[in-house]
């Protein structure tokens, strides 16, 4: 390891499928060590993970970082949002965590919206209309289907909260991740007592919301990680807010993240409140807002189509009239939790490469449909779209986004932006800087800019038409999921 110019910090990304750790030089942003370990996620009706494997994965990822992790002066955890972690009086999981892409709580989401004033009231109150991904709907599902688990629950956490608490011994969260629960009111920046009472959740079970820039705690004794006792622990945040920190985002710059889920978002000074539910009015991690639209089906769904066709994910061919809506896990944008994948326009001469390109088109169209709603009215519509996430490095993803957006696309060379954003937050504790300023000093958005091409309005219109015509079928879903 080359000598660092400044103190070392650790940024962590505990995502759906793995936990990644970066050891970063706070002065330069240079990644001096990295590690990664996988998680397992249940299949079948729901999507669940045992939270204890996140801790084990964190331990393994840090072990891979070697001596550099032992020298860290501060650490921060970024994590998948919305997951419901229920803990007993000993801090052990009562049951596996229900993850963000577990859509079994769709009926509870619809009922909660109706019972508490409708979509407009929810948007004005919490910033978002809760879909099946939101934590409050999962708690309501648990109350209906597993009441014994609720009775055993003595603490409720989000995935990043769980790891932070195991480090510090204190139950904390941040405004960014809390804003995805459905029980944190963006209008007051506090937990909503009426919503909590309605779903039977004692606020004493919830973590303290740590302010941006505040120290969440220090690393305690009795853990098996390489950190020294007293190492500073930052608040952490949800994955999208962490990536926004990692990019050093300023208001108005659009981002499209291509991962297991797909997201489009931008930082805004205005508190969002979209009554249609397309845009979630999340808080960001340093005092502004992060209007965001999310799809459940992105890289994983397209890779599944490629695997079914026995094709490399880059083996696409120009589409001619075929439409594939890759809603393999139900869908959030558009709000079709019971949907499955749908293929239209198949002909004798349709090729596998065309089907694969149609899957890319279907995934990207869903994201672009929400982009204008995410951006403020005065945002520059010709500004480059920042393309991040695992899919951003793929040529087929890049070209599909260019063709369907008609915008220039910039692909930052910095990798692991969630972990990098967490590292910037940890560095801010040491230097007193805003984490976004830290990331800008690290020049994290540097990367090639792909010029704009003419937008493919014909494909966008065709996909929108199929989606409209098939809506009743997609809403009904299949008997087996």
What are these model-derived regions, one by one?
Residues 198-205:
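A structural motif corresponding to the C-terminal end of an alpha-helix
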Residues 1-96, 124, 152, 227-235, ...:
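N-terminal glycine/serine-rich phosphate-binding loop of ATP-dependent small-molecule kinases
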Residues 10-12, 106, 113-126, 134-136, ...:
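Active-site core segments that coordinate phosphate-bearing ligands/cofactors
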Residues 70, 204, 380:
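Structured loop/turn residues at beta-strand edges in well-structured enzyme cores
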Residues 63, 67-100, 126-133, 164-185, ...:
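Short beta-strand-loop/turn "lid" adjacent to the catalytic site in phosphate-handling enzymes
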Residues 21-23, 29, 75, 102, ...:
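Conserved small-residue
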């Amino acid at each position: 390891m080359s000598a660092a110019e400044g103190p070392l910090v650790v940024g962590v990304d505990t995502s759906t499928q793995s936990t990644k750790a970066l050891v970063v030089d706070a002065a330069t942003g240079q990644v001096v060590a990295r590690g990664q370990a996988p998680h397992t996620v249940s299949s079948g009706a729901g999507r669940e993970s045992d939270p204890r494997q996140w801790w084990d994965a964190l331990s393994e990822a840090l072990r891979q970082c070697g001596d550099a992790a032992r020298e860290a002066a501060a650490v921060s955890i970024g994590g998948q949002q919305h997951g419901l972690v229920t803990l007993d009086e000993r801090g052990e999981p009562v049951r596996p965590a229900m993850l963000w892409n577990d859509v079994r709580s769709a009926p509870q989401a619809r009922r909660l919206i109706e019972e508490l004033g409708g979509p407009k009231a929810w948007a004005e109150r919490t910033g978002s209309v809760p879909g099946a991904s939101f934590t409050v709907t999962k708690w309501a599902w648990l109350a209906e289907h597993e009441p014994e688990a609720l009775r055993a629950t003595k603490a409720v956490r989000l995935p990043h909260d769980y790891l932070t608490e195991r480090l510090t011994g204190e139950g904390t969260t941040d405004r960014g991740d809390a804003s995805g629960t459905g029980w944190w009111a963006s209008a007051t920046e506090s937990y909503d007592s009426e919503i909590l009472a309605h779903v039977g959740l004692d606020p004493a079970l919830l973590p303290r919301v740590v302010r941006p820039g505040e120290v969440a705690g220090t690393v305690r004794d009795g853990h098996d990680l390489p950190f020294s006792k007293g190492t500073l622990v930052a608040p952490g945040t949800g994955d999208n807010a962490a990536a926004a920190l990692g990019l050093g985002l300023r208001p108005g710059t659009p981002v499209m993240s291509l991962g297991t889920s797909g997201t489009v978002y931008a930082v805004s000074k205005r508190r969002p409140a979209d009554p249609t539910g397309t845009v979630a009015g999340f808080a960001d991690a340093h005092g502004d807002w992060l209007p965001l639209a999310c799809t459940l089906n992105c890289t994983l769904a397209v890779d599944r189509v490629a695997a079914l066709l026995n094709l490399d994910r880059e083996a696409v061919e120009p589409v001619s009239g075929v439409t594939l809506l890759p809603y393999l896990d139900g869908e959030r944008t558009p709000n079709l939790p019971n949907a499955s994948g749908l293929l239209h326009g198949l002909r004798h001469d349709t090729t596998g490469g065309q089907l694969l390109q149609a899957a890319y088109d279907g995934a990207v169209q869903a994201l672009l449909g929400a982009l204008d709603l995410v951006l403020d009215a005065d945002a520059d519509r010709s500004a480059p779209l920042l393309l991040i996430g695992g899919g951003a490095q793929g040529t087929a993803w890049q070209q599909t986004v260019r063709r369907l957006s008609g915008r220039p696309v910039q692909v930052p060379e910095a990798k692991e932006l969630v972990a990098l954003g967490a590292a910037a937050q940890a560095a801010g504790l040491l230097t007193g800087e805003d984490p976004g300023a830290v990331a800008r000093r690290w020049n994290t958005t540097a990367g090639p800019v792909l010029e704009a091409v003419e937008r493919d309005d014909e494909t966008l219109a065709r996909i929108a038409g199929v989606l409209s015509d098939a809506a009743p079928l997609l809403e009904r879903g299949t008997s087996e999921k």
